[in-house]
C-alpha cells in the first residue's frame, strides 16, 4: 500500500498560515513541510516551485474573499439587509483564508509587489461592488450607498488594528451598534 500524500490544499493552507505569521519571506518549503509533519518531497507533486505555491495561495485567497464569500451569502438568501447581516456574521467567524491575519499579510505584501497589488485591487473592487449591490437595494441615495460601503469595508480591514478602549462599552457592543446603524 502506498503512502498517503498530504493534500494540496493543506500545503496552501499552511502557506497562508505562515504568510499571516511572518509574511511572504517566511513561506519556505522546508518550513511548511516541518509544520505539516512531512518531507518536502510531496510538495513537488503539486507545485513546480515556491513561486507556484505563492501564486496558488494568492489565487485561493482571492477566490475565497470574493466569489467564495459571495456564494455563501447568496446561498443563505434573504433580502439585502439580511444578506448584509449574514456577511457581517461570516466576516466575524470566517476561516483561515478569510482571516484578518491573512488579509493584513497580503495588504502588506502588496505594498512591495505590483502583481500582488493588482490582485488585491481586483479583490477589493469585487468586494466593494458586492456591497454596492446590497446597500443599493435599500438605500436610494448613491452617496449614502458609497459611504456605507466604505465604512463597512474599512471596518473589515481596520477594526482589528484599533486597540483603543470603547469607554464603558465593550468592543462587541460597539460593533453591534455599527452593524445596526449600517443596516438601518
Q: Which ranges hold each PLM region?
A:
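Hydrophobic alpha-helical connector segments
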Residues: 56, 70-100, 148-152
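Short, basic, alpha-helical segments at the C-terminal edge of helix-turn-helix-like DNA-binding modules
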Residues: 59-66
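N-terminal intrinsically disordered/low-complexity leader segments
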Residues: 1-6
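Amphipathic alpha-helical packing segments from all-alpha helical-bundle domains
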Residues: 98-104, 114-139, 147, 173
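Hydrophobic alpha-helical segments that form the core
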Residues: 107, 142-165, 170-181
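Amphipathic alpha-helical segments that line or abut small-molecule/effector binding pockets
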Residues: 13, 59, 81-96, 105, ...
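Helix-turn-helix
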Residues: 10, 14-52, 56
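An amphipathic alpha-helix signature
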Residues: 12, 66, 85, 125-132, ...
Amino acid at each position: 500500500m502506498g503512502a498517503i500524500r498530504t493534500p494540496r490544499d493543506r500545503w496552501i493552507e499552511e502557506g497562508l498560515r505562515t504568510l499571516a505569521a511572518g509574511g511572504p519571506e517566511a513561506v519556505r518549503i522546508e518550513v511548511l513541510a516541518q509544520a505539516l509533519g512531512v518531507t518536502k518531497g510531496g510538495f513537488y507533486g503539486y507545485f513546480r516551485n515556491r513561486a507556484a505555491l505563492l501564486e496558488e495561495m494568492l489565487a485561493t485567497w482571492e477566490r475565497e474573499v470574493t466569489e467564495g464569500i459571495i456564494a455563501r451569502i447568496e446561498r443563505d438568501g434573504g433580502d439585502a439587509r439580511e444578506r448584509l447581516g449574514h456577511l457581517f456574521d461570516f466576516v466575524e467567524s470566517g476561516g483561515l483564508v478569510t482571516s484578518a491575519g491573512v488579509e493584513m499579510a497580503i495588504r502588506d505584501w502588496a505594498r512591495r509587489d505590483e502583481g500582488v497589488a493588482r490582485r488585491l485591487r481586483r479583490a477589493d473592487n469585487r468586494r466593494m461592488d458586492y456591497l454596492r449591490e446590497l446597500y443599493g437595494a435599500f438605500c436610494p441615495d448613491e452617496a449614502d450607498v458609497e459611504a456605507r460601503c466604505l465604512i463597512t469595508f474599512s471596518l473589515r480591514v481596520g477594526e482589528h488594528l484599533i486597540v483603543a478602549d470603547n469607554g464603558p462599552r465593550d468592543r462587541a457592543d460597539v460593533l453591534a451598534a455599527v452593524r445596526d446603524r449600517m443596516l438601518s
